[in-house]
């Protein structure tokens, strides 16, 4: 029930936070525990790795943008998966790797390879994705599990995660799962919570 704009704002907020604070936070921690010489060496290394990861991510974006009408060729898809795997394997702690894995999951869903999509989203959650990005990935993972009729697993995923600003979407999805499982009372409770959280979000936006 929460608007699509909410997810877009979550992603944009994460991108902005990383651009403004992510690298400074990492380098700041090192400065506390390291000396000036170590700082210079580490600063150079991190900057180099960040730029390399950024370049690979830009290649992925360029490949997608150049596809006519958004229709990716098989060559495009192979290229995106290849560069995504490179980011995951060589720069797995960066936001670029997390976004690449999410992109790979999207392509896997479009290819009806739900197992691969689930693996990619789990990789994001297991490899230090920022808290701002986690609720989006968690919700998508739960819906994928539901799509292959793993309803109890989908519920478990949602119940064990912090929904962040996606509380309404989490509760609505829980309601859908409870209905499939014929747990009607719990479904109505979840739907009511979704409505309340959605109204609360609307008030914050106004």
What kind of feature is each model-predicted range?
Residues 1-31:
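N-terminal positive-inside, membrane-proximal cytosolic segments immediately preceding the first
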Residues 84, 91, 127-128, 164-165, ...:
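Alpha-helical junction/boundary sensor with strong preference for TPR arrays
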Residues 58-90:
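Short extracytoplasmic
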Residues 51-52, 56, 76-79, 92, ...:
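Structural signature of alpha-solenoid helical repeat junctions
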Residues 77, 97-169:
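Alpha-helical adaptor scaffolds
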